[in-house]
Amino acid sequence: MALNLQDKKAIVAEVNEAASGALSAVVADSRGVPVAAMTVLRKQAREAGVYMKVVRNTLARRAVEGTEYECLTDTFTGPSLLAFSNEHPGAAARLFKDFAKENKDFEIKAAAFEGAVTDADVLATLPTYDEAIARLMMCMKEASAGKLVRTIAAVRDQKEEAAA
């Protein structure tokens, strides 16, 4: 479909706005993936707070100029599906990683976080806020139990020395 200049400018502005407010970005190739599966992916992306759009490579390069995702311009070859995570840095990577397990033709090209290209698997394994809090609480709980055991052992040792 031919796009006139106004449509191209609108697409660039829309993607640039999404990139400016995003926490991370993922680029993927969706060649060979059935339309029904892509529709499901788009629905899951909306639910996860992920902005997703298929953009021409030239327009994608222009859209990410001046943003922290300019490092992704080398990956814009072939069909490019852009996804920007708005709520959690690992949301798009996690979504794409799960989708790639079910659809063998779906390929994750690259991911970016804080202005640098990074491995999508690393982004996908980032804990959510609630998971991070739970891990922190577990560590604190384990540390206090360890201190209690050491304190009781020290008291026992003191009593044994006093009795001897």
Curated annotation (Swiss-Prot):
Q: Which domain of life is it from?
A: Bacteria
Per the record, the GO terms for biological process are: translation
The chain's disulfide connectivity reads: none
One GO CC annotation: ribosome
UniProt key word Ribonucleoprotein? yes
What Gene3D superfamilies does the annotation carry? Answer: 3.30.70.1730, 6.10.250.2350
Q: Which InterPro entries match?
A: Ribosomal_uL10 (IPR001790), Ribosomal_uL10-like_sf (IPR043141), Ribosomal_uL10_bac (IPR022973), Ribosomal_uL10_bac_type (IPR047865)
Q: GO molecular function, one example?
A: large ribosomal subunit rRNA binding
| Pfam name, any one | Ribosomal_L10
This protein's UniProt keywords: Ribonucleoprotein, Ribosomal protein, RNA-binding, rRNA-binding
| SUPFAM superfamilies referenced in this protein's UniProt entry, alphabetically | Ribosomal protein L10-like
**PANTHER family attached here?**
39S RIBOSOMAL PROTEIN L10, MITOCHONDRIAL
Quaternary structure per UniProt?
Part of the ribosomal stalk of the 50S ribosomal subunit. The N-terminus interacts with L11 and the large rRNA to form the base of the stalk. The C-terminus forms an elongated spine to which L12 dimers bind in a sequential fashion forming a multimeric L10(L12)X complex.
> What does the similarity note say?
Belongs to the universal ribosomal protein uL10 family.
HAMAP family listed in its UniProt record:
Ribosomal_uL10
Entry function: Forms part of the ribosomal stalk, playing a central role in the interaction of the ribosome with GTP-bound translation factors.
What is the recorded name of this protein? Large ribosomal subunit protein uL10
Q: Which organism is it from?
A: Aliivibrio fischeri (strain MJ11) (Vibrio fischeri)
**What is the primary gene name for this protein?**
rplJ
